[in-house]
């Protein structure tokens, strides 16, 4: 037993190095799988040649970029399934791009005079082996991490215990990492004693002045701190340290999308939406015919939505419900949804007509989801800051849609939208577009990439 504890202590001491080793082995094995198997018929990719240099560079650059977008080897931070899914998607896209690049380079007078896909069997074998490697190394990494690190004892401090049940439920989803030991109000008499007994303190909807005192006490007692942000926190996160004479300040400047960013964003919207409409035109046509044939009703559902600066426009979707039915939210087995509509909703095909909204300039590819006018009015009454999200043009996908779930509160959606607006960049838009592809492969109810709430209310 003593030897076991000493071994665990040694592993704990070199925890980061061991996890780095697992990560290195995984990436190296995936890399070797691709190049060694393709080298069977392409000896030039493992020699000193231009083909080898270009192929190697393409593979490494794509893998680096895509793991940055979809998620890295974050053992201990995410579930094994989530890590495997992200890394697998990054590896597959990397393989596809590198495979086509290699095929194009082989299209010459010395090899094939016309473009021809070769070694397709090897390509799929590479993907299969890489998936097994990723699964094995991720499972090994997470198993090792949670063997070394026990679950953090979490104390949730709140103003309303009822509001924090959702937080507790979210933490319970990661039972190996978090152990919820209690939910208490911030004004209980023995709060400090409860904090001392915890490893991590989660502050949810705690008044700012109280939060400051709790954070100070946690800092003194070396406790991890999680807190949900207020509007001011988001505005301050991009602050710069400024010294005027000998007085220090945090300067938080009003963030506006620049003229250059606006032009690039609009050009991306035009070209990508036009490309999407061309590629999906068969799906659009078949969907329209199926809807019309089913009940002879209208093909498109139209509804007024709010976009940048409160401008009102008509959003387009495929009609998925029977016509002339009640105006209340849809349940999973709602008989108002047609069989065709259920299929369209499941695969989010009902959202495709919104590419016309993007092409005409009413929407953007990336941005806060356009809310129904009634929702904007109601949310603004509840949260006056909700109007801040109208500083950016509404989008088909965005940070709140990708991170959020179908039951994400209006306040949390607002916070996510403001994080997107305050940290806006063209690269961020590109990253979110790639992440949307990841979301499309997830379970229907796992996220709201194309907001479930909104598409459920056809009014």
PLM feature spans:
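A short, structured surface patch at a secondary-structure boundary
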Residues: 332-393, 432-440
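A hydrophobic, helix-centered structural microdomain
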Residues: 260-323, 432-459
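C-terminal terminal-structure detector
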Residues: 2-7, 387-459
């Amino acid at each position: 037993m003593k030897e076991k504890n000493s071994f665990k202590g040694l592993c704990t001491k070199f925890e980061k190095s061991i996890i780095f080793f697992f990560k290195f082995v995984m990436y190296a094995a995936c890399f070797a799988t691709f190049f060694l198997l393709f080298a069977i018929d392409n000896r030039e990719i493992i020699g000193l040649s231009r083909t080898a240099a270009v192929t190697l560079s393409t593979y490494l650059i794509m893998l680096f970029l895509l793991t940055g977008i979809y998620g890295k080897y974050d053992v201990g931070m995410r579930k094994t399934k989530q890590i495997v899914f992200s890394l697998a998607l990054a590896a597959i896209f990397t393989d596809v791009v590198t495979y086509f690049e290699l095929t194009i380079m082989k299209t010459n007078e010395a090899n094939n005079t016309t473009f021809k896909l070769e070694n397709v069997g090897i390509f799929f074998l590479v993907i299969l082996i890489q998936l097994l490697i990723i699964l094995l190394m991720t499972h090994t990494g997470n198993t090792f991490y949670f063997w070394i690190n026990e679950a953090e004892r979490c104390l949730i401090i709140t103003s309303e215990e009822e509001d924090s049940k959702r937080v507790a439920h979210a933490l319970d989803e990661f039972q190996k990492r978090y152990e919820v030991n209690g939910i208490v109000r911030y004004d209980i008499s023995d709060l400090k004693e409860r904090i001392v007994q915890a490893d991590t303190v989660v502050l949810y909807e705690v008044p700012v002045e109280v939060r400051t005192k709790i954070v100070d006490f946690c800092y003194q007692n070396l406790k991890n701190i999680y807190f949900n942000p207020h509007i001011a926190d988001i505005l301050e996160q991009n602050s710069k340290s400024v010294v005027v004479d000998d007085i220090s300040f945090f300067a938080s400047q009003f963030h506006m999308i620049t003229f250059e960013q606006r032009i690039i964003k609009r050009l991306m919207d035009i070209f990508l939406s036009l490309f999407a409409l061309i590629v999906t035109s068969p799906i659009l046509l078949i969907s329209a015919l199926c809807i019309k044939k089913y009940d002879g009703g209208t093909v498109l559902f139209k509804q007024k939505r709010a976009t940048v600066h409160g401008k009102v426009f008509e959003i387009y979707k495929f009609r998925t419900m029977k016509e002339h039915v009640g105006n209340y939210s849809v349940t999973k087995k709602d008989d108002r949804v047609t069989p065709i509509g259920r299929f369209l909703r499941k695969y989010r095909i009902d959202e495709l007509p919104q590419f016309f909204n993007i092409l005409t300039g009413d929407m953007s590819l990336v941005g806060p989801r356009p809310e129904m006018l009634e929702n904007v009015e109601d949310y603004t009454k509840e949260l006056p800051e909700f109007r801040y999200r109208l500083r950016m043009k509404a989008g088909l996908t965005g940070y709140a849609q990708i991170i959020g779930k179908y039951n994400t509160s209006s306040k949390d959606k607002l916070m996510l939208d403001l994080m997107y607006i305050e940290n806006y960049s063209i690269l961020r838009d590109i990253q979110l577009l790639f992440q949307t592809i990841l979301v499309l492969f997830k379970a229907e109810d796992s996220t709201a990439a194309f907001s479930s709430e909104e598409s459920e209310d056809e009014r």
